[in-house]
Amino acid sequence: MEFSERRNINRGYRKLKVWQDAIGYYALTCEVFRAFPVVLQRLAAQQFASVDSIHRNIAEGYCRRSLKEYLQFLNFGLSSAGESVSGLHAYRNANQVSEVDFERLDAAAWKLENGLKRLIESLQSKQREGGWQESFVIRESNTAYHVAETEGRPSQRRPPVRGRKK
């Protein structure tokens, strides 16, 4: 998967294999459910929503930077994957999805669910060991921001107050 040059630490989730798998699962879901007849569009919309929320929860959790919140959102994504697979079983049993499409979607969901479970287990291990950095670390010089320093501290000069007559 290729990305634009617009990169920053907040967009790092795009490198995660589980996020890429979730995007692939969504694309495959669109391919299969786009062909649903009009009378089943509500069901198709529910399937789109459950699958779409997986990659969104992975990204949102990643961007939160708190390990507790990250794990919470990964678990939301895992729950959405379960919801989508439950729908697949119902659609297959009602002959609304072919066996071939069911197998393709179920295989993609299975791979994604296992990836999410491994990521969650890995992060829980880091949580137990205390090996998680919850803050953004900026390694730049203050001169890039034109910060005036007085005695080793940033200037305490206040901006002029507007609107008062002297």
Language-model segments: what does each one mean?
Residues 1-166:
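Amphipathic alpha-helical assembly/interaction segments
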